[in-house]
Amino acid sequence: ASDVYKRQVWYVPGGQSTIGILLKDANARYIFSDDQHSGSLPMSPEQILAKGSQVDVWAFKYFGGAPLSQVQLLQEYDGYKALAAFSRGNIYQVDTSTVPYFELTSFHPELLLREFIILAHGERFGKLRFYKK
């Protein structure tokens, strides 16, 4: 799963979006890889949970100034606990208020590709630069 639930909508990258293509290039299992949209997809939480409850990793971006705990995430939306990645603790987040994520990845997609390879295949390929567990 990708990104977070906001006001009854959960936005995820389309399968043909830049993120969707980078996930494919990273040989990551992305639940919306078969989607043909090149932008973000507005989904209901029910749609996400129906298709993605068994995802291995949940990675998202937010603007906040401090890491989000699992308790804080559940306070925001209790449905997160239905994600297998949540119960296994495979949650990776990048705080875009403290990390130059957009500034760097916009011009260096290879940095983001590397992050996705590590997220999908483990840290045997190195340490994450942007995302934190």
Features from the language model and the residues they span:
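Second-shell loop/turn segments in exported
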Residues: 6-13, 33-36, 99-106
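Stable alpha-helical elements in mature extracytoplasmic
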Residues: 15-22, 28, 44, 109-112
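Structured C-terminal subdomain patch of bacterial secreted/periplasmic proteins
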Residues: 60-133
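His/Asp/Glu-enriched short active-site or ligand-binding loop at hydrolase and phosphoryl-transfer sites
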Residues: 19-40, 59-62, 93-95
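Extracellular/periplasmic catalytic domains that process cell-envelope and extracellular macromolecules
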Residues: 24, 50-52, 83-87
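Short, small-residue-biased leader/transition segments that mark boundaries at the very start
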Residues: 1-5
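Short helices/loops that flank or line small-molecule/ion binding pockets
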Residues: 43-54
